[in-house]
Amino acid sequence: MNQSLLSPFGTAIERVETALISLKQGRGVLVVDDEDRENEGDLIYSAETLTNEQMALLIREGSGIVCLCLPDERVKHLALPPMVENNSSQYGTAFTVSIEAKEGVTTGVSAADRVTTIKTAIADDAQPDDLARPGHVYPLRAQPGGVMTRRGHTEGTIDLMILAGLKPAGVLCEITNPDGTMARLAEIISFGAKHDLPVLTIEDIVEYRKSLMAEAS
């Protein structure tokens, strides 16, 4: 079903290439996971190029839970422990404690404040003491190996940033419909057309990475 609805946007490889161009240009992408998994679409931006306007769109059109995807080594560097010791969530989503920048924010809730927190966390010279805990940004720890290890939006986000030549850090939020229900692929495609955002799937990223590995072998 996913692939048939997405076929007008090209092959899996072409959809990833289009997404990488969008990210390199500082724009966002929409990533849908498998229909037999969460079957949800996330709006994703590079943390490196994220703007206040983009954050406002995430908050306005999404679930409100704005997450910062980080690789394992960055999570360890920032000394961010897991949100819970025993993760019993259905898909093992690796939330850490939530964070807030210690400087440059007010309540931490506004779009500008959340962007400040994200930029603080991904700064080259970032230190654990730069961040207060808890806060209004929710870091997610990506599994090493990306989508080849776990087919989640967290890993897909990090893979896309690396493939685009950007810092391995991305911001995501699930897209919801006006009535509060989760947007599925058909609604995600309509949302993408409205906001000029390319749409791709986690499976597309898997296929793209497999093609790169095949070329290298």
Swiss-Prot record:
Its EC number is 4.1.99.12. InterPro entries: DHBP_synth_RibB-like_a/b_dom, DHBP_synthase_RibB. The keyword GTP-binding does not apply. Transmembrane segments: none annotated. Mg(2+) 1 binds at residue 38. Its cofactor is Mg(2+); Mn(2+). Binds 2 divalent metal cations per subunit. Magnesium or manganese. Mg(2+) 2 binds at residues 38, 153. The record marks 136, 174 as: Essential for catalytic activity. Pathway: Cofactor biosynthesis; riboflavin biosynthesis; 2-hydroxy-3-oxobutyl phosphate from D-ribulose 5-phosphate: step 1/1. One of its GO terms (molecular function) is magnesium ion binding. D-ribulose 5-phosphate binds at residues 37-38, 42, 150-154, 174. The keyword DNA-binding does not apply. One of its GO terms (cellular component) is cytosol. It catalyses: D-ribulose 5-phosphate = (2S)-2-hydroxy-3-oxobutyl phosphate + formate + H(+). Keywords: Lyase, Magnesium, Manganese, Metal-binding, Riboflavin biosynthesis. It comes from the Bacteria. One of its GO terms (biological process) is riboflavin biosynthetic process. SUPFAM superfamilies: YrdC/RibB. PANTHER family: 3,4-DIHYDROXY-2-BUTANONE 4-PHOSPHATE SYNTHASE, GTP CYCLOHYDROLASE II-RELATED. Belongs to the DHBP synthase family. Homodimer. Catalyzes the conversion of D-ribulose 5-phosphate to formate and 3,4-dihydroxy-2-butanone 4-phosphate. This is 3,4-dihydroxy-2-butanone 4-phosphate synthase. The lineage of its organism: Bacteria, Pseudomonadati, Pseudomonadota, Gammaproteobacteria, Alteromonadales.
